[in-house]
Amino acid sequence: MKQKADNLIAQNKKANHDYFIKETLEAGIALTGTEIKSIRARRINLRDGYVQIINGSAFLENVHISEYKEGNRYNHDPLRSRRLLLHKREIARLAGIQAQQGMAIIPLKVYLKHGFAKVLIGVGQGKKQYDKRQTIKKRDQDREIHRKYGI
């Protein structure tokens, strides 16, 4: 039987531009009813989001999930902190990484897997301005080689 591909909802393209992604990790998200309905409608923005470890729990901060239009008075706060569902050893490892200088834990993608919302979080090290220029230069060189030789 053919496996159904994960249903990609949102992607943080700015993360690959601003960070060197060292490793990735999949986590579940604790959501309310109107939040999951808004996510299914693809009304989520990951651009300024980050993960913070507080008292042994991981939280997704500053991720904007728009209010559900039929949610009336039961709607959620668009920028509230959302708990990530991870094992204790994963949270402990992320807490150690978060304590290091220059390391950030950021959301890369949000997708639906078997009906549940999942977030792919990445451990990244911030790029300097010259690193960004080198990345652009390398991309242009690769594009030129591909255009010239058809590799």
Swiss-Prot record:
GO molecular function: RNA binding
UniProt KW Cytoplasm keyword: yes
Main location class: cytoplasm
Highest taxon listed in the record's lineage: Bacteria
Record bears the keyword Cytoplasm: yes
Assigned GO CC terms: cytosol
Subcellular localization: Cytoplasm
Matches recorded under Gene3D superfamilies: 2.40.280.10
Region (Disordered): 132-151
Keywords, sorted A to Z: Cytoplasm, RNA-binding
GO biological process, one term: trans-translation
Coiled coil region boundaries: none
Protein family membership: Belongs to the SmpB family.
Known function: Required for rescue of stalled ribosomes mediated by trans-translation. Binds to transfer-messenger RNA (tmRNA), required for stable association of tmRNA with ribosomes. tmRNA and SmpB together mimic tRNA shape, replacing the anticodon stem-loop with SmpB. tmRNA is encoded by the ssrA gene; the 2 termini fold to resemble tRNA(Ala) and it encodes a 'tag peptide', a short internal open reading frame. During trans-translation Ala-aminoacylated tmRNA acts like a tRNA, entering the A-site of stalled ribosomes, displacing the stalled mRNA.
Name of the protein described by the UniProt record: SsrA-binding protein
